[in-house]
Amino acid sequence: MLKSILMVWVLAQNVVLTEQAYQDYLGYRKVDEGVVPTELARAIERPDLAGRPFMTMMPATGPQVGIRVVQGGDQGYQPMKRVGWSAIELLVEDPEQLKRNLQGSLFRHLQGPDFLTDERNILAMQVSGPNQQLFYLTHMLDPSKSFLQPEPSPAQVGHTFIMVMGSPDISASLEFWRTYFSNDLVGPIPYRIGVLSEAYD
């Protein structure tokens, strides 16, 4: 069973600029850097990434889930318009304050903060990052009320706890996770996602 996210990868047209933005506005710190080994690039079926520079960043405190930024990316990339991994969801302390802090940065505000359900337990905001990657910045008032029950983070901007995936066939995707990883599944649940709706307006 898959239990914890250890690291996520994003492609960046400018790794140095991305590092600075994550450091200045998310409070993340660089923990390593290097180039993508050919063997690894082949293993993930992305041979074009072999030899590309990367750096890995972690939140200041709390659970250490890395974001590995790899040189690459498509200038025409648009979040939510491709299948596969679409967004990174981070636990944050105060979405309202974070919205103010991100003004004038390379992070562009999209929606929120808004409560996602009538229970008013999950307050979330969506922003796009320096390379158009989509972030959900989420605060749970009481994590014990969520079926995920994530470990709280003491950092203003904490760790990745959800990855959002676009799928052309939800049933097939759920069956894949059930068959190969024995993960518990919830849903599918009908739900209107504002940033997804706007992407196709």
Describe every region a protein language model picked out.
Residues M1, Q20, D24, D74-Q78:
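Polar low-complexity intrinsically disordered regions
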Residues S4, V15-T18, Q126:
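Short N-terminal amphipathic alpha-helix/helix-capping patch enriched in small hydrophobics
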Residues I5, V83-A87, T160-F161:
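Eukaryotic phosphotyrosine signaling hubs
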Residues W9-V10, V31-V35, V65-V70, E89-L90, ...:
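Vicinal oxygen chelate
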Residues M1-L2, M80-K81, S153-V157:
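Short, flexible turn/loop "capping" segments at secondary-structure junctions
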Residues V31, L40-T56, G62-W85, E93, ...:
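Post-signal peptide N-terminal segment of secreted/secretory-pathway proteins
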Residues V10-G62, F115-D118, M165-D201:
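Core segments of cupin and vicinal oxygen chelate
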